[in-house]
Regions:
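DE-rich acidic low-complexity regions and acidic surface loops
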Residues: 1-309
Length: 309
């Protein structure tokens, strides 16, 4: 199967089309400069507790307050808050690996037991703002790489269900155990099956470094919260991270800044594939050139063709 990623950039929107053997199979659109993306991490301030909803509204700097439900605090919220408190001005601060973890959140508790108005909390955007609604948040923080997802405040190693080989499971668990500090766990993704030991080790260490930079940003921004602590990569790079494999033959981009961004990202995760990133300079719009526009239009026609009839 031959895969291509076609990226169209306009001043207001980024459109990303994934094609398999020239057939459009996935289309993603992302608004430019919205300021909030899924995966972004913030130091927010609790604005209002809603006991009836068992939820709270949190100010993260958006025009609309963000929403967090009790179940989205995550089991390790007390440990997370202990870390946030240690990073406040005048406090010495400490690392996750040196912490004694707090008892987990009860599954049937009340949000008022853990949050109060004015409290600073570390949160991650789980769902972007839609219409009049602000972003949806989680305090169950995780950092995704190509091969792994880092999960602080646990020592568990989880494997993708698609990894079935006993030998491969043993290899991946061995790699994780050798690299992970105390109180850090990982979810090992399907992509790790094709990865070398050193690539997985590097991915884990990269996510640990990102986490440490995020924690350092708490101390820097505690006096001026709400503040962004860590920004997730753009949507194009996220798709590449999650789906890049040997079947990709081309990534075509019609914007030079985005081209350089994607090329730089691939150089980090899979240098030998950097050459498949192409800057499109044609006079015809990129989606027209690759027959994307026509396929999108046909999806909204009265009759839609399906594979195998």
């Amino acid at each position: 199967m031959n895969r291509e990623l076609i990226v169209n950039v306009t001043p207001t929107e980024i459109s990303i089309a994934m094609c398999e053997d020239k057939v459009l199979v996935e289309l993603n659109k992302e608004q430019c400069q919205t300021g909030f993306a899924v995966g972004d991490i913030y130091l927010g301030k609790v604005r209002k507790i809603m006991p009836g909803l068992n939820a709270a509204f949190v100010n993260i700097g958006h025009e609309k307050d963000a929403f967090i439900h009790y179940l989205d605090l995550g089991p390790q919220f007390p440990s997370l808050q202990k870390l946030v408190a240690s990073q406040q001005p005048g406090k010495r601060g400490f690392r996750v690996e040196s912490m004694k973890l707090e008892p987990p959140v009860e599954k049937t508790g009340k949000i008022g037991e853990y949050l109060q108005v004015g409290q600073q909390i570390m949160v991650q955007v789980a769902k972007e703002a839609i219409s009049t609604k602000g972003p949806r948040l989680t305090a169950d923080i995780s950092l995704a790489g190509r091969n792994v997802v880092l999960v602080p405040f646990t020592s568990k190693v989880f494997l993708s269900q698609k990894i079935r080989s006993a030998d491969e499971k043993k290899r991946l668990k061995r790699i994780a155990a050798a690299v992970l500090p105390k109180n850090f766990g990982v979810i090992i993704r399907t992509a790790a099956m094709e990865a070398k030991d050193e690539d997985i080790e590097h991915d884990i260490q990269t996510q640990i470094d990102r986490w440490r930079k995020t924690c350092a940003a708490i101390k820097k921004n505690a006096a001026s919260a709400p503040a962004q602590l860590m920004s997730e990569m753009n949507r194009a790079n996220t798709i590449i991270r999650d789906s890049l494999n040997g079947s990709f033959s081309q990534i075509a981009v019609d914007d030079e800044a985005m081209y350089n961004d994607i090329r730089g990202y691939i150089r980090q995760i899979e240098p030998e594939k950097e050459k498949i990133v192409k800057l499109y300079r044609g006079n015809v719009p990129i989606f027209d050139n690759f027959d994307i526009s026509k396929q999108i239009k046909s999806l909204f026609a009265k009759y839609v063709s399906l594979r195998r009839g």
